[in-house]
A protein has these predicted regions:
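Alpha-helical transmembrane segments of multi-pass integral membrane proteins
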Residues: 1-207
């Protein structure tokens, strides 16, 4: 019962936080349809994580999904007129990408194994945040772009490699995910190269 109330509290917090940050975007004149799509994507991760929490609480994949869902909206704070919220929105704009990278490498058991996997997750967490901090003070996006492309390339190697080395039963589980992730990573890498750095800089790099 206590877990259910905690799930409800986290879900309510996530819904309220997401709605509040999307209101900031609407105030900036962002198209309502785009705001709605953005809201739905973030809440899908959040609610999916909460559902997984209820089904398999010992599998920490749910925690990473909730992290993606909540982190998805942090970059929206960059549009706030409050200087503190604005700074938070820029510096921590890549929280969703950081958690997503960890989620990709932790799937399906919820644990990150292997030095290379841990290195990529640590690089995403420290590197992207530091790059956003640099952008906040200098306006230079180049480090974020370089780190983002490195992470994209690393995942494009590590995820298929994990499938290749997995036993047959695990391959069946990883197969569809590997295909979907590979396509998404290639698309993201191409878009980042032309438009903005990986992780979105969701507050710093909204086109």
């Amino acid at each position: 019962m206590r877990v259910r109330w905690l799930q409800f509290a986290v879900g309510a917090l996530g819904l309220g936080f997401g709605a509040a940050t999307e209101a900031i975007q609407i105030g900036l004149g962002v198209n309502a349809e785009r705001v709605l799509i953005d809201f739905v994507v973030g809440e899908t991760y959040l609610l999916g994580g909460l559902f997984a929490w209820g089904r398999q609480p010992r599998n920490r994949t749910w925690l990473l999904m909730v992290g993606v869902g909540l982190g998805w909206f942090v970059g929206n704070l960059a549009g706030s007129t409050d200087p503190v919220l604005h700074a938070i929105g820029i510096i921590f704009a890549d929280l969703d990408a950081i958690f997503l990278n960890a989620l990709i490498l932790a799937y399906p058991f919820g644990s990150i194994e292997g030095r290379a996997d841990r290195f990529v997750v640590a690089t995403a967490a420290v590197g992207l945040t530091a790059a956003n901090l640099l952008f906040y003070f200098t306006g230079n996006l180049a480090p974020n772009l370089v780190i983002g492309l490195f992470i994209t390339a690393a995942l494009a190697v590590l995820v298929p490699r994990r499938w290749w080395l997995a036993p047959p039963q695990l391959r069946r589980v990883l197969g569809p995910a590997v295909l979907a992730i590979s396509v998404v990573l290639l698309a993201i890498g191409g878009l980042r190269t032309r438009h903005r750095p990986l992780g979105g800089g969701r507050g710093t790099g909204r086109p």
